[in-house]
Amino acid sequence: LFQTLNTTTVGSMTIEEDGDVITFGNPDDSGPHVYLNILSEQFWVRLMLVQDLGFAEAYMAGEVSVNNLVDFVRFYIYNRASLDAASASPVVSSLMYLASTRFGNSILNTASNISAHYDLGNEMFEMFLDSTMTYSCAIWNGPDDTLEAAQLRKLDMLIDKACVKPTDYVLDLGCGWGSLSMRAVERTGCRVLGITLSTEQKDIAEQRIAQAGMSDRIEIMLIDYRKLDPEMYCFDKIISLEMVEHVGYEYLPVYFEQCHKLLHHQHGVMVLQSSTMNEERYSEYRHSVDFINKHIFPGGHCPSVSALVAGATKGSRGMLMLESAANFPDHYARTLRVWRERFLCGFDKVLSTVAPKNAQLILQEQELAGGQYQLPACASSTSSLTEIGNGSSALPDVYKHSNTTPEAGYNDVFRRKWEYYFAYCEGAFATRAIGCTQLVFTRTYNEDLSDPRFLM
């Protein structure tokens, strides 16, 4: 590992352990400069076994401290070519990937995958989101812009790109807490069907819609998108706001086929916003497990732009035509930075003494985060990755250092995990390793797009 760090070309990393300090790279260049303090020898075990995922879990466990998490991510991305040479055990990596396939987004699995993230408790999301409860990339305008204004700007952009009209019936595909549905009705008077698989989101969305007096225009359903019957529903517009990341690579054609069947055959418009993986790394990413799809979004998949377009072409048999594409990674980096600041500022005040509404989900997270990984049937159910990798004892549960239990409140490991999640994604978007892409699809003979709102 140290030999690999010696080959880094951008920025520097200083590592301290038990008073010993060593620096790698060039502290004088303009790249990120990272300082790590190793607090437990278990850090090295995790790092050598599962590399960047091991680092994330060591941070969750309190086995390492970092002066700047975002700069750490930037350092890793800039030096990925050399750092990946110190790759994780191929046996471990293969087993990790096989184990992750149990989170595949079949109809049976998808509801539990969604619940594992979005049903952690509305009070947690309320703490870092703005009053619109919009959990997606905002579109910013100047350094003094507020999160709420930036989120409304994003919602307006999607509504305008879809050319939503008062007479339209709109599908809000993955409606969250209802902000897009409500904004569309507020601006145009259209009718909206919002669908979600999160019971927590549905409850809050319906409350907010009723309070706004929009219940006659908006319906929220707890349903998988694949179960909407095209014989019963025909939508003029479909807007999918950062939902396709929960679909899974193998289901992209199925997703677009269903959208094609639900969308009006002539004047239909579909607008999609998604985080998108760099094309260069996409094949490798598809066959690996990372921090996000293990600890944050089980079953999650960050598609590439070409995978989305190919899925749309295959699923619709060429009848969903790509109209436009735009990328906003810098806007997502700023959004994540603001979320992280709000999360950390409010955690001790809001969450540390609040019992999660669904504590069992956090208990399940402990099983995922601990040293005992759940392996597929081809491996012993009692084996840990450490035992498989080098025959030593199992890694300690990252939750053993927690000061509180899930029953008592959101614990400090939960806090470090979400802090790492925000910083990890911010660094990836800031370096454009990940994009935030808006795609517009329409029908070949759709003349409605001459609307001047669309021609911006």
Task: Please report, for each region that a protein language model flagged, where it lies by residue.
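Conserved class I S-adenosyl-L-methionine
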Residues: 166-174
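Substrate-binding/catalytic lobe of Class I Rossmann-like enzymes that use SAM or dcSAM, i.e.
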Residues: 275-445
